[in-house]
Curated annotation (Swiss-Prot):
Interacts with hair keratins. This is Keratin-associated protein 5-2. Restricted to hair root, not detected in any other tissues. Sequence repeats lie at residues 62-65, 118-121, 137-140, 147-150, 157-160, 167-170. In the hair cortex, hair keratin intermediate filaments are embedded in an interfilamentous matrix, consisting of hair keratin-associated protein (KRTAP), which are essential for the formation of a rigid and resistant hair shaft through their extensive disulfide bond cross-linking with abundant cysteine residues of hair keratins. The matrix proteins include the high-sulfur and high-glycine-tyrosine keratins. GO terms for cellular component: cytosol; intermediate filament.
């Protein structure tokens, strides 16, 4: 039977590995390297991504190819997602899905988000750099021109954010009418 893209003990073709494939089980029959239509015997896609470094990924033997090599959102400091999402099984769509990574596509469109994926929407006012982006994609966030670090941006920006003179500390005041 096919090895169903097992990450250990398989050759490049992964065909006819038998017991050397280790852990695929009969539920994976005939999947091939694409891992489409795998059964639960393939090991699933748990959130065991190990460390939370830049190369922290969900397991290779993912039965959903779209989730196989995107950053593992289960680690808060992993990749660009920054959420607390589960493994590949709960991923929907590309880059972890819109719902749990910061707003829906509709919400992004209403505040001028130009990114195709809503995993990390960017809703800056004109003139604001990438560090002035708001994660929740509700309203634009604007820092003073003297702001040079992301900590000078306000996370819940209903009005433009005014940083104090010392922009190296996360102290902001919100301008209210």
């Amino acid at each position: 039977m096919g090895c169903c893209g097992c990450s250990r003990g398989c050759g490049s073709g992964c065909g006819g590995c038998g017991s050397s494939c280790g852990g695929c089980g009969s539920g994976c029959g005939g999947c091939g390297s694409g891992r489409g239509g795998c059964g639960s015997g393939c090991g699933g896609c748990s959130s065991s991504c190990g460390g939370c470094g830049s190369r922290c990924y969900v397991p290779v033997c993912c039965c959903k190819p779209v989730c196989s090599w995107v950053p593992a959102c289960s680690c808060t400091s992993c990749g660009s997602c920054g959420g607390s999402k589960g493994g590949c099984g709960s991923c929907g769509g590309s880059k972890g899905g819109c719902g749990s990574c910061g707003g829906s596509k509709g919400g992004c469109g209403s505040c001028g988000c130009s990114q195709s994926s809503c995993c990390k929407p960017c809703c800056c006012s004109s003139g604001c750099g990438s560090s002035c982006c708001q994660s929740s994609c509700c309203k634009p966030c604007c820092c003073q021109s003297s702001c040079c670090v992301p900590v000078c941006c306000q996370s819940s920006c209903c009005k433009p954010c005014c940083c104090q003179s010392n922009c190296c500390v996360p102290v902001c005041c919100q301008c209210k009418i």
